[in-house]
Amino acid sequence: MSEPTKTDPIKVYDARWETDEFTPLEIRRFIEAVLIYGRGLGVDTVTIARDARLGSGSVMEIALKSAVQAGFTVYLCTDPISTPQSYFLSFWASKDHPKTMGLTITASHNPANYVGLKVVVPGVQAIGLNCGPDGGFAKIREIYHGSETLQLGAGGKLILVDPTERYLRFSMRAAGIEDGELEGMKVILDALNGSAGPELCRALQQAGVSVLPLRLIPDGTFPSGSPNPTSRNKMDEAVALAGKTGAVLVIGTDGDGDRLVFGNARGIMNAGFASTPILRKLLAGGSASGTSLPKPAKIIYDPKVNPLALVEWAKLDIKPVLFGNGHSQIKEHMRRIGALAAVEESGHYYHSLTTEGLTFFAENSLVTVFLLVKALKENPELMGNMWALQDRVFTTGEINYQMADDETRDRALQAVLQYFKDDHAVLVSETEEGIDLLGTIVCRGVDLDAGKLESDWYNGYLRAATNEKSVLRFYLSAGSFDLGMQIEQKTRDIFGRYPGNAID
């Protein structure tokens, strides 16, 4: 095999690449590096799953062939499933094979021309760059660029599986939901042609929910664009349908089903507010996690969760814990501090799940959805209460700009940060524990320790994207709509001075 180039598919959270960016030979070398890493951890079993995107099939073929030839027992799900279901598959295999590694072939909410890989190691522990045993993807990168080869092994075995029914039952038990319990509830489900639509629809119907689906069929071409429900206007059709049908809840999910948005006929809610009834159910024992809860319960939040939501969380006897973006990194931090859950404003909800003696930390979109629908059934006024809070906050949603190159991106980033410095904002780039936030919080008039917000408060988060080339991401919340719109326009004006374009 020829030497791989010094570039590689590895990013901060996982691996992600455009389908024409690397040759099949390079992808095979990358998969082999992952398996060499796993073998060093004592792995003997590998689960392999995929989402619906078109590039996933060829990567799955390479992964399957490499793993079986190397002597691993492989549990393979060939049908497109969600990333949360793939984590369950790894958990299920771990019951009989504790040294299981899970490979999920996905590029999440990225455009159709992307593909990627998420990895969990024994204990269903997610890895990232410098995150996980031996540095996680940092070790895989070292192997990829090194000379070590994957040794062939005897005894390789392929077992085809369909974990959906087991995943559905596991999730219903975890959420404390019985068959038919949510009868009378009507929801709109927009799956954006991702892989999670069928399993979400099936689970909700099993619980008695009337589901009106949109873009339900998995389609890796993503005909309506990037499968990101947090993008502006992406959920407009679902919101309009809720108004016409009287549905109590709108649910949107991304390409691999680990990102959720919630709303109703009025629009889509911030995750900080939508998560509040979910967290309340968790604290009240609405999720059968099997764990006793410390007081106050630690809930991790990312820099984009708006401060007013955090003030509401504190009323629930919650200790909000700031941490940067990064799915693997967040789950590892949950493990370290014993957090009950975590919420990212991007729509990622993480749970601590304990069953059959194993605790693992992962997204489970079925559990998240079940808990919210159950809360709405028990309290029909709940959505109105959440909107009353959201009406007090201006938010931009995620603003994304694709710059001409990384150098241009970095210059634009510094220009925006200088604008906030000149506005006497507080700039924060790490947690109190010194953990890098992988971006910069810009805030003014926010005192979370005292639970106080000034009338002209704002809170923003600015960072360079880790999984896409030359992309800047910005998110803003503010206590004044006029101030929020003013800051948004100023930020867009600064971005516009540099070669590039706004993207979804």
Describe each PLM feature range.
Residues 2-4, 115-245:
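Gly/Ser/Thr-enriched, mixed-charge loops and adjacent short helices
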Residues 75-83, 268-271, 323-325:
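Active-site nucleophile and cofactor-binding loops and adjacent substrate-binding regions
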Residues 213-215, 267-286, 358-371:
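Gly/Ser/Thr-rich active-site loops/lids in small-molecule metabolic enzymes
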Residues 36, 44-114, 202-263:
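N-terminal small/polar loop signature for handling phosphorylated ligands or for N-terminal nucleophile
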Residues 99-114, 242-264, 269, 320-362:
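Glycine-rich phosphate-binding loop
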